[in-house]
A protein has these predicted regions:
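Mg2+/Mn2+-dependent nuclease catalytic core
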Residues: 95-168
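Metal-dependent nuclease catalytic cores that hydrolyze phosphodiester bonds in DNA/RNA
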Residues: 1-108
Length: 168
């Protein structure tokens, strides 16, 4: 079988505003829509400042991983060391970071990690930096990854997603 390569979604992602654009149309991200539908009160009891600090921490961990994968720069953080160990232990072969997928109509999102498991098969992973992985957060991540898998398989003809990982 011929090796399947990931394709560009055509979606422009504005990282600063966290917006997805396909031409003139703004698309919605999956995670927040799922969170609002499944767990609308998930963060209501948490002070805004705490949420901002958690978001900043999550962004820094994601950036640390992305810089390592693109430039082989190891910043020495425990989070990056843990990520490297998890990848080694599970024989994960990096294919892409922050890979944008879309249905081409209404939805788009960035997959944190895409790993190759075969010529036409991929593993997708979401890196979570929650202080505690609750059953609700795990369920939300599973739905999120399932949507990502569906979009990737629609976007990349012939590709299959054979595993979904939550890295926490």
């Amino acid at each position: 079988m011929a090796r399947i390569e990931l394709t560009d979604s055509g979606v422009l992602f504005n990282e600063e505003l966290h917006e997805y654009w396909l031409g003139e149309k703004q698309l919605s991200g999956i995670r927040e829509v799922l969170r609002r539908q499944l767990y609308p009160n998930m963060y209501t009891a948490i002070p805004k400042r705490i949420l901002e600090m958690a978001a900043d921490y999550g962004t820094s961990v994601h950036k640390s991983i992305e810089v390592f994968q693109k430039n082989w720069i190891n910043d020495g953080t425990q989070e990056l060391q843990d990520f490297i160990r998890i990848c080694k232990e599970n024989n994960l072969i990096h294919e892409a970071s922050e890979y944008t997928v879309t249905d081409g109509k209404n939805w788009a999102s960035n997959i944190d990690q895409v790993f190759r498991s075969g010529d036409d098969t991929f593993i997708i992973a979401d890196v979570k930096t929650y202080s505690k992985m609750t059953p609700e957060k795990q369920e939300l991540a599973r739905y999120q990854l399932s949507c990502y898998a569906m979009f990737l398989e629609q976007q990349v003809k012939g590709a299959k997603v054979d595993r979904l990982y939550i890295i926490h």
